[in-house]
Amino acid sequence: MYTDDKRIVITLDAGGTNLVFGAMQSGEFIVEPVTLPSQAQNLDLCMQTMVEGFSRIIAALGERKPAAISFAFPGPADYPHGIIGGGYLPNFPSFRDGVALGPFLEEHFGIPVFINNDGDLFAYGEALCGVLPEINARLEAAGSSKRYKNLIGYTFGTGFGIGMVVDNRLNRGDNSCVETFCLPHRNMPGIIVEEGVSV
């Protein structure tokens, strides 16, 4: 889908344990990824780590200029405005009071910043360029007229997330992410599902 897109986008996979930075062009990573500890318990250290990671990727690009920063973040947030947190975030407790991360990074690096939920982006990526088109291509090759356009994707890591695509559109829910956020664990009273299933 984006194989001829010459724009360079700096990426980040923001996990509760590690932050993994990269740069993509035409759907391919073009520099060696940078992995740094997330420092999720300390807001100042976490923000410094993000600036360091993005700066190292920009340095690795040399003369090539990125068009934007785009990345995934766990949990509910005001993603359209780049504000992370504002509630219970077990993987990033230092973001609990809400952090204007998108505007901070835009001001620091001078390029647009796009942030979305990690579970949502996983599901949307699989719907656009992953398993869903692969299944539909197999159906077409087999002579079937059936095509799928709905998908639910689950993510397991330090946390647990879900993304949902319905009629080829990302369903963001009413908190900018469709997931089992703070759902009580049925078999383990006192903890949420995320704490009971994550690795």
Predicted regions: what is each one?
Residues 93, 139-199:
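Glycine-rich phosphate-binding loop of actin/hexokinase-like ATP-binding domains
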Residues 17, 74-77, 157-159:
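Short glycine-rich anion-binding loops that position phosphate/pyrophosphate groups of nucleotides
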Residues 3-4, 61-66, 144-147:
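Short helix-terminating capping/connector loops at secondary-structure junctions
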Residues 2-52, 84-86, 170, 174-189:
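Short glycine-rich, Thr/Ser-proximal phosphate-binding strand/loop in the N-terminal lobe
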